[in-house]
């Protein structure tokens, strides 16, 4: 129904769902209500809703549709389905497609191994497995694998390699595997070792930490300082990932603690995972434009998040009371979790910690206030430039030339959408920019920007305009920004902008909000370009020195550990053995290469 024709008298007082749409019919927001008439009155009546983000939503809303249901449970389920279907901008919509880092022990093999996996849920074909986690990062996951390899000598090879091996591998020589593949240990001995490793993963880390501390002390006494430092880093990671913190009062429970930070329309949700008494870490979900009440936000978030999570805890702590008592029973689990707002001191401490973590995630965005209105008027845009792309390139004397594109969308940098380009054309910066822009806009697999910003002057502006015209792309505003040579005032840089309105360029005052915003974008693009260049340059360095029989992966591992070829060649045999994948034959090759005259 058109909003100007909308009458609250015609709205049912039953439970239901409402859809707010713009003039194009796009669904902006989906909400549920116990009483549709009362809920919609809070939007339509003056001073009915005090939330700052609501006027912004209502400015864009031209139509409201309602769907009446029998009860609140139906309303929750319908709301969730409609959010998934329409993906409205102002709702909680989980776009974080990352899976979870876990450690898996497959029980289908007579000699189980522990491996790192990324999963959304238990695979149907692999029900006979134990899962440990999820862990907050890959680093934490692989650090635990490294500890297990050091202290619990279980096999790490694939099932195929296990079945075909004829003799023990180098890990057996290093006492990091019992070599069950060739029958050098009994089933009982192997199972006892596996049980100890599983006990460690369940939280019994005291003996392992004690052994690591002794190993660090021994390495220091023997002046093997690099080895001691590596062990210390491992110990630190174990303590961060496994050690019990101030949540010991809850060690009998698995708890997720949800926190929320808001600023304007920005909402950030944090999820602290407390697993068997251990605070593992947090995951964060950022919603740039959210118009839901806190209670509705958490209800919607819980329904979506735990539909994808391989583990549903026994309890979920939230900072506000939810008005959906049936919510736990809508989750796909045999044992519905308790969802509550804790009243105990420790529960409040955890909620405060979750809020603090969410607020920390907002810090990079707090200083960014895009001057959308000024941009729209200055460049005569038909709408706010919600998606902006900024381009830069980097090289050193023409070598390892790289280009990058960074994305600023809905008021936030979007690193997931950043792109890098290895430039193949040989020439000046103009040729490099032309290649990058052509490759970006020839492939229309991603959303087009409203505005593109380029680090450059008049020539870059003309080239960019020509490329967009050749590709028949309209509605994209091009701006280039360049330092004005010889025009500085007390460390405030004078910058000149080139655009369609000012093709000859215009100088903006250093305090201009538009100029400062563009400088922020350019600095981020430059940072990302330098980062990508260094990675490419480092990869090229790996190929400058080659040892016959030592591949790129092993070369990288050697240089990561020893930092230079000189230190690789003077390393002892025992030190070289600590590098993953290095065999006795490899050590012989390294020593032979190091013995050659320079």
Curated annotation (Swiss-Prot):
BP term (GO), one: SOS response
UniProtKB keywords: Cytoplasm, DNA damage, DNA excision, DNA repair, Excision nuclease, SOS response
SMART domains: GIYc
Source organism: Chlamydia trachomatis serovar D (strain ATCC VR-885 / DSM 19411 / UW-3/Cx)
Name under which the protein is recorded: UvrABC system protein C
Assembly, per entry: Interacts with UvrB in an incision complex.
InterPro entries for this protein: GIY-YIG_endonuc, GIY-YIG_endonuc_sf, GIY-YIG_UvrC_Cho, RuvA_2-like, UVR_dom, UVR_dom_sf, UvrABC_protein_C, UvrC
One Pfam family this sequence matches: GIY-YIG
Residues covered by the UVR domain: 206-241
Described purpose of this protein according to its UniProt entry: The UvrABC repair system catalyzes the recognition and processing of DNA lesions. UvrC both incises the 5' and 3' sides of the lesion. The N-terminal half is responsible for the 3' incision and the C-terminal half is responsible for the 5' incision.
SUPFAM superfamilies the record matches: C-terminal UvrC-binding domain of UvrB, GIY-YIG endonuclease, RuvA domain 2-like
Gene: uvrC
Similarity comment: Belongs to the UvrC family.
UniProt GO MF annotations: DNA binding; excinuclease ABC activity
Domain GIY-YIG as annotated: residue spans: 13-92
HAMAP family given in the database record: UvrC (MF_00203)
Localization, UniProt: Cytoplasm
GO cellular component, one term: cytoplasm
Top-level division of the source organism's lineage: Bacteria
